Amino acid sequence: MEVIRIFNKVAERLDKEAAIRIFVLAHQLERDKLIRLLQGLLWRLRFRKPKSKDCLCWFCCRLYYWQLQSTLSIDTA
């Protein structure tokens, strides 16, 4: 739960592509390393204003990632 909360805070300051990349990376890293990465990003982006164009919460990034996967599988088929 802590990971999702920190991810949401970081993602609101990123563009859509960067948020999806962090989402994918989140599934490849150990929990402790991911939390340290997200806290570092949150510190680095602390003065950047939130971008409100797209919702980039954990669940929306999951949806965007699934859409991207289905698009890529259709294109390669």
Curated annotation (Swiss-Prot):
Task: Supply one GO CC term from the record.
Answer: host cell nucleus
- Residue stretches spanning the membrane: none
- Its source organism is Feline immunodeficiency virus (strain San Diego) (FIV)
Please give the chief subcellular localization of this protein.
virion
- What keywords sit in the KW lines? Host nucleus, Virion
The protein's name? Probable Vpr-like protein
Entry-linked InterPro entries: FIV_OrfA
What is the annotated role of this protein in its UniProt record? Answer: Seems to function as a Vpr-like protein, since it mediates host cell cycle arrest in G2 phase. Cell cycle arrest creates a favorable environment for maximizing viral expression and production.
The short motif Nuclear export signal is annotated over 34-42
Motif extent (Nuclear localization signal): 44-53
Q: What Pfam families does this protein map onto?
A: OrfA
